[in-house]
UniProtKB/Swiss-Prot annotation:
HAMAP family documented for this protein: Salvage_MtnB_euk
Lineage, highest ranks first: Eukaryota, Fungi, Dikarya, Ascomycota, Pezizomycotina
GO cellular component term of the entry, any: cytoplasm
Keyword Lipid biosynthesis: no
Subcellular location, record wording: Cytoplasm
Sequence ranges of Polar residues compositional bias: 1-20
Cofactor(s) annotated in UniProt: Zn(2+)
Pathway: Amino-acid biosynthesis; L-methionine biosynthesis via salvage pathway; L-methionine from S-methyl-5-thio-alpha-D-ribose 1-phosphate: step 2/6
UniProt family annotation: Belongs to the aldolase class II family. MtnB subfamily.
Source taxon at top rank: Eukaryota
Function: Catalyzes the dehydration of methylthioribulose-1-phosphate (MTRu-1-P) into 2,3-diketo-5-methylthiopentyl-1-phosphate (DK-MTP-1-P).
Binding residues annotated for Zn(2+), in chain numbering: H123, H125, H210
GO MF, one example: zinc ion binding
Protein name: Methylthioribulose-1-phosphate dehydratase
Length: 258
């Protein structure tokens, strides 16, 4: 049989998204997106999520109301096949839903899977993420390319970096790079990849006036890091309203010896 292309797939591959297991990627993506919708992360069909299970990549479609998504709406492709293809804009999908278009986030999700071996990547349009990039914009050229914050307990929710063990500590500085937005989402790919190369320990990239991409080794880590990051973004916005600095110099407190 000739392989399907341009987002079309053989009907027989519907088995790839059929499972009674709630932890199956095709079931998990809709349930996660429904939760994210309640948080305002994927409003108006924006944002999305993708899960990698070995070589199979499951992706939420474009244009679907995320709180209403079903397993039958999910795209599936082979990660190895994408790595071998020279045409990034004409992807071959193992399975495609009949009524939707492939997500323009796809190449950005794939960057997290190929460059970081991530198991899950989440893209949100969180207004806290957007506000942080706008605040950084007011700092002037050269000071608007990174979000930095330290001495906040929630920073412990992030790993130390790619292929490093352990998590960041309370006194560590969390650094999230910021890239400029483009008219078409897929055109962000090279800038996201450049940020990943420049910041090898980051688990997220902010997109100015747009949102954020967050990834993790698995669904649990991607989700909790996304939650922690949104908490920190909201905190940072409210700190700025109170003229409180994001970076502080605090002496570590050591326990008294008994």
């Amino acid at each position: 049989m000739t392989p399907p292309s341009n987002g079309q797939a053989a009907e027989t591959n519907d088995h790839l998204v059929q499972s009674d297991n709630p932890e199956h990627p095709a079931n998990l993506i809709p349930s996660l997106c429904a939760k994210f919708w309640t948080l305002g992360w994927v409003t108006g069909t924006g944002g999305g999520a993708s899960i990698r299970e070995d070589d199979l990549v499951y992706i939420a479609p474009s244009g679907v109301q995320k709180e209403l998504m079903k397993a039958s709406d999910i795209y599936v492709l082979s990660l190895a096949a994408q790595a071998q293809s020279l045409d990034r804009r004409n992807r071959v999908y193992l399975r495609s839903p009949p009524s939707y278009k492939p997500s323009q986030c796809t190449p950005l999700f794939l960057a997290a899977f190929t460059k970081r071996r991530a198991g899950c990547c989440i893209h949100t349009h969180s207004h806290w993420a957007v506000l942080v990039t706008l605040i950084l914009e007011t700092q002037g050229a050269g000071k608007d390319r990174e979000f930095r914050i330290n001495n906040i307990e929630q920073i412990k929710g992030f790993g130390k970096g790619f292929e490093k063990s352990g998590n960041l500590g309370y006194h560590d500085t969390l650094v999230i790079p910021v890239i400029e937005n483009t008219a078409h989402e897929e055109d962000l790919t090279e800038f996201l990849e450049e940020a990943m190369d420049k910041y090898p320990d980051t688990y997220a990239v902010l997109v100015r006036r747009h949102g954020v991409y967050v990834w993790g080794d698995n669904v649990h880590k991607a989700k909790t890091q996304c939650e922690s990051l949104d908490y920190l973004f909201q905190l940072a916005v409210e700190m700025k309203q109170l003229n409180l600095p994001w970076i502080t110099d605090i002496e570590p407190v050591t326990p008294r010896k008994s």
